[in-house]
From Swiss-Prot:
Family in the record: Belongs to the VPRBP/DCAF1 family.
Feature: compositional bias, Acidic residues: 1396-1483, 1490-1501
Function: Acts both as a substrate recognition component of E3 ubiquitin-protein ligase complexes and as an atypical serine/threonine-protein kinase, playing key roles in various processes such as cell cycle, telomerase regulation and histone modification. Probable substrate-specific adapter of a DCX (DDB1-CUL4-X-box) E3 ubiquitin-protein ligase complex, named CUL4A-RBX1-DDB1-DCAF1/VPRBP complex, which mediates ubiquitination and proteasome-dependent degradation of proteins such as NF2.
Localization: Cytoplasm; Nucleus; Cytoplasm, Cytoskeleton, Microtubule organizing center, Centrosome
Domain LisH: 846-878
UniProt-recorded name of the protein: DDB1- and CUL4-associated factor 1
Any one annotated GO CC term: fibrillar center
Modified residues (Phosphothreonine): T888
Amino acid sequence: MTTVVVHVDSKAELTTLLEQWEKEHGSGQDMVPILTRMSQLIEKETEEYRKGDPDPFDDRHPGRADPECMLGHLLRILFKNDDFMNALVNAYVMTSREPPLNTAACRLLLDIMPGLETAVVFQEKEGIVENLFKWAREADQPLRTYSTGLLGGAMENQDIAANYRDENSQLVAIVLRRLRELQLQEVALRQENKRPSPRKLSSEPLLPLDEEAVDMDYGDMAVDVVDGDQEEASGDMEISFHLDSGHKTSSRVNSTTKPEDGGLKKNKSAKQGDRENFRKAKQKLGFSSSDPDRMFVELSNSSWSEMSPWVIGTNYTLYPMTPAIEQRLILQYLTPLGEYQELLPIFMQLGSRELMMFYIDLKQTNDVLLTFEALKHLASLLLHNKFATEFVAHGGVQKLLEIPRPSMAATGVSMCLYYLSYNQDAMERVCMHPHNVLSDVVNYTLWLMECSHASGCCHATMFFSICFSFRAVLELFDRYDGLRRLVNLISTLEILNLEDQGALLSDDEIFASRQTGKHTCMALRKYFEAHLAIKLEQVKQSLQRTEGGILVHPQPPYKACSYTHEQIVEMMEFLIEYGPAQLYWEPAEVFLKLSCVQLLLQLISIACNWKTYYARNDTVRFALDVLAILTVVPKIQLQLAESVDVLDEAGSTVSTVGISIILGVAEGEFFIHDAEIQKSALQIIINCVCGPDNRISSIGKFISGTPRRKLPQNPKSSEHTLAKMWNVVQSNNGIKVLLSLLSIKMPITDADQIRALACKALVGLSRSSTVRQIISKLPLFSSCQIQQLMKEPVLQDKRSDHVKFCKYAAELIERVSGKPLLIGTDVSLARLQKADVVAQSRISFPEKELLLLIRNHLISKGLGETATVLTKEADLPMTAASHSSAFTPVTAAASPVSLPRTPRIANGIATRLGSHAAVGASAPSAPTAHPQPRPPQGPLALPGPSYAGNSPLIGRISFIRERPSPCNGRKIRVLRQKSDHGAYSQSPAIKKQLDRHLPSPPTLDSIITEYLREQHARCKNPVATCPPFSLFTPHQCPEPKQRRQAPINFTSRLNRRASFPKYGGVDGGCFDRHLIFSRFRPISVFREANEDESGFTCCAFSARERFLMLGTCTGQLKLYNVFSGQEEASYNCHNSAITHLEPSRDGSLLLTSATWSQPLSALWGMKSVFDMKHSFTEDHYVEFSKHSQDRVIGTKGDIAHIYDIQTGNKLLTLFNPDLANNYKRNCATFNPTDDLVLNDGVLWDVRSAQAIHKFDKFNMNISGVFHPNGLEVIINTEIWDLRTFHLLHTVPALDQCRVVFNHTGTVMYGAMLQADDEDDLMEERMKSPFGSSFRTFNATDYKPIATIDVKRNIFDLCTDTKDCYLAVIENQGSMDALNMDTVCRLYEVGRQRLAEDEDEEEDQEEEEQEEEDDDEDDDDTDDLDELDTDQLLEAELEEDDNNENAGEDGDNDFSPSDEELANLLEEGEDGEDEDSDADEEVELILGDTDSSDNSDLEDDIILSLNE
């Protein structure tokens, strides 16, 4: 209560003083008493604030660090009074010439520095710094010391320090001499008085060290030696505690650090809470530790009054001036200048090191504030290599370790150790100290990491990050259980608590926690990198002991070992490849025991959502790098296959597989164009899927890092782990992620490397037969996409990465195809098979055709007599021009340059395989420019038919013979090439042999044969056994055709039905479907009658198909007569747009779904009264079961619900979060027999409610449908076999299309539907060329039939059971406009659009455009929405008129189905050929299809409903 009163008094007194100042200001009164009293108030509250033991490096405004503290309130009161602050600086400091007033003002300014924006004061107020320099040199006490302290605040700004270099050089020397004098006076006074210090009790330290409370940390970091250059220091130091404040800048301690690295503040209560969390975590993990707070309570015999001078300090008043205060303020000035290289000689010359050794000894100073300031100055000097080396050599480290803890000075030690760690030479000397000294250093730093202020913890963590490269430090860290201590830093973070994520924390505390996470992950990465190198040495030494060789001697423990990222990757690859199957690695075992893999995965998942945190990317990357190193151990890999609790987008806890988090990051889902993160994530995947499936035998002898430890080995365990990882990566859509990364183009500087890594992961994954089968059917291989990617790098400067990508891509092709390839060959799997057939084909041609060509050539060159002789001798026909027309194109096409390269591929394969005998019989010879192959010699001779070229005496060339092997010539040519380039040294004997057998020119028959083989290679379906080729007519292998193949011409097929029912031969039905479903004729348009804009959203035919059911955007259901076009009924079903309609087959029930209103879906009765039977509140999509229609399946997000139609009860819920694919437009559906369900890309058994199989995900939206044949599943572009779960085909044209089958299941409609939101809509419009069109496909072989462009965006489409009509919901509005005017257009299937229809439609579109232009000119002032409405309305009315006129005859001819069939038959007899074909085909389909409807009284039902 007293404290509260005092606080209130302070606040009130300051307010009173300000009021008094306002009265007396300008009246000539003496202001010194007012300013002095203000200073006393501020100093008193500063001491109270410091009693809370705040972080001494926390440079935030005190009111921000502790909103309850009175110091913050007082500072705010002062800063709000602009008049007073301006007078304080301008009048009392800058312009006044009265020393007492100057002194009082400087004292107050010094007191309020913790809340002051120093840059504003010292940079914007000209002349103030000059005044301070003058006073610091010449003024009397205490003004001289106050101005020196204020200059310390000014010099924190680097720009100011740079502007006053000369003044600083002079003043530094002056104050150092003063410091030396004051220190000597202090020593002399102490010796004179002989008074013992309060601390001089015994040789024991004042505050005994609690060894058990010391926690340990580790990390490894490439050491950057800091020479003291300001900018280098600021670049390397990744630690700061500055948070932006309205009044205050960073303190000098942080001027060498990154300013955005934010402020860390921990008040007393927060510290106690953190320690409590820490203790709980340790108890939970099963480790014992004493409470660090025991230090005071149990281990000290002294009272707090005696201890406080060494813990928080007591002397916060600046008057009267004492030597301690003067020394403290001088050190405050020197601290920001300590890091400047140009001032180092002055510091060295004037004995700064000896001074600092004195000041950091609390036994000498008896003032923790003075010692703390000295430690800050010492830290800045330690940036210099020379000073740091001398400091270590003269026992400086031991002096630091004598500083008692906990205390403010101990936190200062943390910064000294951190800065010292940056100096590699100095750290080497530290590591060469006696073992107990280095042990104390590690121990002390571990205590700082666990029990110090937040800044001390951060400095200690960073110290270990750098020093893990020294093996001596690493070993001591492990000895003191450092890994657990380090991990506890993040395991106790509130922001990783999934329940509240630190909801009660302030922004500063959240930022501080994130900083802790970042620094800890960085230290963990360095720790495991250092251990990885040690483990690699152990494995190599074991291998060398086993297989012989010289042992590798490790580097001395006091030497730093730093490694590049490439070296780390190589180490991981070596351990995975050559390490034992049951690799035992102590750090990984400890990490596993502490459940830290799940912890890191949670951190990655949560950190992905730290959108405002500047180091979010670094934090995630460090954590990923740790996991990458750890995944060299199979046990850790298996941890990634386990479930982890993470937060979803809504903030609720969900369970997901660890590898899915990694895959999400690799895909770039959270970090757009951050290549480093993607590469780290890919490295984890590579480590998991690229391990050896069979280990080298000698490795089995090496079990562990320590010779003593032997583990039982299961030879199958590594294969089991590998197979499990393949499966878990595949089941979490790893194939999709990796394939998407193969075509990545951004960021351009790293795209090639990301491609290479993704391809490497695919190579490892493709060893799984399941994955291999799926990949082989994807466009990547089936359409040569991977060869296109191999042609050019994304960035020419990254060719080395592209070469790696090509290497892995070639390996991937070899794995998938089963055949070796030459890198860079443009080949798909189909081409490989084709090339194999071509290579085996025997090429022959008529002899006389060649002679005719020769004769024609001779005539064209004017050699008529020779031609005549040839004609007589060869008995050729006399007419020279008979084949000239055929000859010309053959000659023109004979250039080998323009021919396909496929035969060369086959030849390349054969050459690589080296099967000379086989090649001799089958491999083709490429046309080459080098001389003709010589006869085979020596080892190159091949068995087989004799080579005609061997005997030049034979006059007649045999054309029908086995083709010579190209390998003879190729082999010799390879030898010659190597010789020419100096890569192969021939012996003189071989050279002479080659000279004797110079290659002869290619023979004419070899040129002709090669030309014909190239022609044969162009055949779509080449056959191995061919008839003789003609030189005058292009060769074409016949298409594969069955004996009873139906003719393509419809009339011929119709005539053949008598012989070959039922479709006129094999594939007749397919030809019929191609004819019918490529023709659609618009016949009528349905729109809402009384509305300005029509708003249909979905459509369905009624059971007997006399009516068209249309859902509107207002939730109404409207029924239109198909034949008259009149609206027959209207019902209010929902309060939002209807998205789906499905009537039952008997017409008695109807399912509807809406966008957002409750209920989302409903089941309606349509017998005597239209009423709601059941509602499905949360299911956004519902449909009937296929076979019996006794159940309804509803979809809610990723969950499927099955309901009973009679009772409405929920029968089953089908959902497994571990298998979820999270398709955006998931729609659960039954298979044709109702015993299987496809939901979210997962196949379920309805009877057992168990998931059967998860189909791989290759798109984000479409969840898939069953083919009506019940044997296949179609998910977007992929066709899956239900019996084997193999991927059968990919149909790129189906991308992002909704699939609708006709009643017989023989034809498939695909339409890209409108997206739910505008972003998706624009994305899909850009992605797909079919936004305003629908396509038809043959549902038996998935070949496209036709693309019908309706020139408007499609919302929905449906077809009737007889394949007569197709209804399409089209948006009449502009593509770019936000307004929507949707109508339902009815198309007649199998009818061609008439020419007059097309002309009228073009005229109508032109008129619409003209009207829009006129309206824009006339109605500039009209409201935008009204303008759009009017235009669309006028255009639509006119279009309706045109359509009605155009389709009048058709409308009159409408009648029930029997009459329609009769009309079609009549038209088929009299019509022209094309129309006859179409009409007959329509009759054919309708004749074979029968309706299964049970409702013969549909008209009566509709009438009764209306009544």
